Amino acid sequence: MADRTSSSITIKAAKADIMAVIADLEAYPEWASGIREFTVQETGPDGRALRGRLTFDGGPFSDTVGLAYTWDGDDRVSWELVEKGTVVTGLHGTYALAEAGGGTEVTYELAVDVRVPMIGMVKRKGEKRIIDSALKGLKRRAER
């Protein structure tokens, strides 16, 4: 899973406020298109998810997967696939937040592997669509 796709957006909100939106995983269906359900299965001492199950509808593919999360304060969160779905066989993602002139720059990086053979360019285009949609939804949610 060496190839990763990433994109960034500047959000007019503090890092802590944006990370609070990101950390509220069970609310993702309200603002992240394609996410049907998220269930937190285990939390850490800070109340943030350590493990969860994500169900998504991604156009031609729908799946449910298990994810493990690693949090670095309000600076970064990463997640890894720990329970494969019927379609998704590998997944790694991160949100990295950095202060940027009156706002916060949020960079979302994603790599997804699927059982269905897919040309790299098509796979990256799909990842880019997921990332851009998530960043726009995050911006709307955090700036409201």
Enumerate the predicted regions with their spans.
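Hydrophobic-ligand binding "helix-grip"
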Residues: 29-33, 37-44, 55-103, 111-113, ...
